[in-house]
UniProtKB/Swiss-Prot annotation:
Subunit structure comment from the entry: Part of the 30S ribosomal subunit. Forms a bridge to the 50S subunit in the 70S ribosome, contacting the 23S rRNA.
Record HAMAP family: Ribosomal_uS15_B
Compositional bias segments (type: Polar residues): 1-10
Organism per entry: Xylella fastidiosa (strain Temecula1 / ATCC 700964)
SUPFAM superfamilies in the record: S15/NS1 RNA-binding domain (SSF47060)
Name of the protein in question: Small ribosomal subunit protein uS15
GO CC annotation: cytosolic small ribosomal subunit
InterPro entries: Ribosomal_uS15, Ribosomal_uS15_bac-type, uS15_NS1_RNA-bd_sf
Described function: One of the primary rRNA binding proteins, it binds directly to 16S rRNA where it helps nucleate assembly of the platform of the 30S subunit by binding and bridging several RNA helices of the 16S rRNA. Forms an intersubunit bridge (bridge B4) with the 23S rRNA of the 50S subunit in the ribosome.
PANTHER family in the cross-refs: RIBOSOMAL PROTEIN S15, BACTERIAL AND ORGANELLAR, SMALL RIBOSOMAL SUBUNIT PROTEIN US15M
Gene Ontology BP annotations: translation
Keyword rRNA-binding in record: yes
Keyword 4Fe-4S on entry: no
Length: 86
């Protein structure tokens, strides 16, 4: 169980060498969150990793809020592309 970082970056980058834009960061966090969510269906008592999951969710929320405030159109496209709520 792992994420394919390179393909996620390729699908969400804004320019040729982009790896740090909010879109890429949110997409990577979303993949890691989905992976951990599957992990918790099996390992219900893994509270240490649950803390990491909550930190990732909060970090993603912050990045999405930033993107929404700065460039609303990019925010809307990203939400639709990743299938996130809102």
């Amino acid at each position: 169980m792992s994420i394919d970082t390179q393909s996620i970056i390729e699908n969400n980058k804004r320019s040729a060498h982009d790896t740090g834009s909010p879109e890429v960061q949110v997409a990577l966090l979303t993949a890691r969150i989905e992976l951990l969510t599957k992990h918790f269906k099996i390992h219900k008592k893994d509270h240490h990793s649950r803390r990491g999951l909550l930190q990732m969710v909060n970090r993603r929320r912050s990045l999405l809020d930033y993107l929404n405030k700065k460039e609303n159109e990019r925010y809307k496209l990203l939400i639709e592309k990743l299938g996130l709520r809102r």
